[in-house]
Amino acid sequence: MKLPNILLTGTPGVGKTTLGKELASRSGLKYVNVGDLAREGQLYDGYDEEYGCPILDEDRVVDELEHQMQEGGVIVDYHGCDFFPERWFHIVFVLRTDNGVLYKRLETRGYNEKKLQDNIQCEIFQVLYEEAIASYKEEIVHQLPSNEPEQLEDNINQISKWIEQWVKDHNP
């Protein structure tokens, strides 16, 4: 049976991981958090002193994911999307969060002030939505609100319906 590949993207703190894990457990699709994948495989290309975090080796991440993406049925969670091959994804969801809510979430994570401000700016200017629109066909890119628990449930239901329909349409 053919299964779709889904990309969940958005600024850090918008709820990609919470949504992705819950969606995977309900749909049976495989969940891949690119940050965890990079950590486990040491898929890094240096260290960013300013942000206090490792720099992702994008080519190695793509190589690492290629086989499972070809098989299908994968939910990928990452705060960027411009380096993934366009052919990988059947749909892209950009999660959006109000600045006040996002600020509190990132503060709770212990982000330094520069990292906090840059991520809030990223959300204000819709940087990741613009990146998604530039990287994929516009008709497969959708924005979802992610401010409160009720919206999480709505998003799971909406994406689950989409998965069911995609499976029906692609498995005669």
Swiss-Prot record:
PANTHER family: ADENYLATE KINASE ISOENZYME 6, POS9-ACTIVATING FACTOR FAP7-RELATED. Keywords: ATP-binding, Cytoplasm, Kinase, Nucleotide-binding, Nucleus, Ribosome biogenesis, rRNA processing, Transferase. Its EC number is 2.7.4.3. The gene is Ak6. One of its GO terms (molecular function) is ATP hydrolysis activity. Signal peptide: none annotated. ATP binds at G13, G15, K16, T17, T18, R109. Residues 108-118 are annotated as: LID. It is found in: Cytoplasm; Nucleus, Nucleoplasm; Nucleus, Cajal body. It catalyses: AMP + ATP = 2 ADP; ATP + H2O = ADP + phosphate + H(+). This is Adenylate kinase isoenzyme 6. It comes from the Eukaryota. Broad-specificity nucleoside monophosphate (NMP) kinase that catalyzes the reversible transfer of the terminal phosphate group between nucleoside triphosphates and monophosphates. Also has ATPase activity. Involved in the late cytoplasmic maturation steps of the 40S ribosomal particles, specifically 18S rRNA maturation. While NMP activity is not required for ribosome maturation, ATPase activity is. Associates transiently with small ribosomal subunit protein uS11. ATP hydrolysis breaks the interaction with uS11. The lineage of its organism: Eukaryota, Metazoa, Chordata, Craniata, Vertebrata. It comes from Mus musculus. Pfam families: AAA_18.
